[in-house]
């Protein structure tokens, strides 16, 4: 689907989700995410385009207020807030979506997608539609899937050129059984941790490293506190553009 048609569909979905209030008053949507609002941060790029197009297509009747850097909570807090109507919308990593709808765990399986094109084909097809339907039953509407890129290992211990290189290294992982099992099975020490705690944990040596897309390494300055980046491309990072049913 072309971007213009997709965004038009998104705006229509928001209008329906916003209900009768749209006809009476200007609607304000608080839109959050946990990483930066940097020029190259994929979350920030997506959020800014979303804001611009929603306000354009609704002729200003919907205002999108942006809250980067965990301003309205970590991802788990945000998605739970969407379920209960205390958070309007945001960008949430697949692994965190899986905490409320376990079917999403399939996307985090290591080496499941060979490249972005194959991931797009699956997520834009029947599988993505079924995942969205399941999530809607939990009170959260998927407006679409965004590109997070492939995840890579970054640490202060050693480069990763083979599976054995993960042994004995403490990696911060997302609070998701797929990631915990992945690193544990390789002999690493998997340390589940919220994103907001991670930079300080790496900086202070509580963990040796983590695994994130290269764009997030750059946008959040992880290159300043780590020594080794290994292009493992072990998991495709799907991120969801989500809105509360109650918004």
Segments from the language model and where they lie:
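Sec/Tat signal peptide C-region and signal peptidase I cleavage site
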Residues: 19-23
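N-terminal secretory/targeting leader peptides
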Residues: 4, 8-11, 24-118, 126-127, ...
């Amino acid at each position: 689907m072309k971007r213009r048609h997709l965004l038009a569909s998104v705006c229509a979905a928001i209008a329906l989700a916003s209900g009768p209030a749209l006809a009476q008053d200007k609607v304000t949507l608080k839109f959050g995410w946990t990483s930066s609002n940097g020029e190259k941060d994929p979350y920030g790029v997506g959020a800014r385009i979303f804001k611009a197009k929603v306000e354009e297509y609704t002729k200003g009747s919907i205002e999108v207020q942006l809250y980067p850097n965990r301003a309205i909570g970590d991802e788990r807090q945000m998605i739970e807030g969407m379920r209960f109507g205390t958070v309007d919308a945001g960008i949430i990593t697949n692994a965190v979506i899986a905490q409320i709808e376990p079917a999403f765990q399939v996307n985090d399986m290591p080496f499941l997608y060979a490249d972005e094109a194959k991931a797009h084909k699956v997520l834009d097809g029947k599988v993505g539609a079924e995942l969205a339907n399941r999530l809607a039953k939990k009170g959260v509407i998927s407006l679409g899937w965004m590109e997070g890129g492939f995840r890579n290992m970054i640490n202060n211990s050693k480069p990763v050129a083979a599976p054995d290189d993960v042994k004995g290294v403490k990696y911060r992982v997302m609070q998701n059984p797929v990631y915990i099992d992945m690193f544990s099975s390789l002999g690493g020490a998997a340390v589940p941790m919220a994103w907001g705690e991670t930079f300080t944990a790496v900086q202070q040596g509580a963990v040796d490293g983590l695994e994130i897309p290269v764009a997030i390494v750059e946008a959040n300055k992880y290159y300043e506190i780590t020594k080794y980046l290994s292009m493992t491309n072990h998991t495709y990072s799907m991120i969801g553009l989500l809105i509360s049913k109650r918004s």
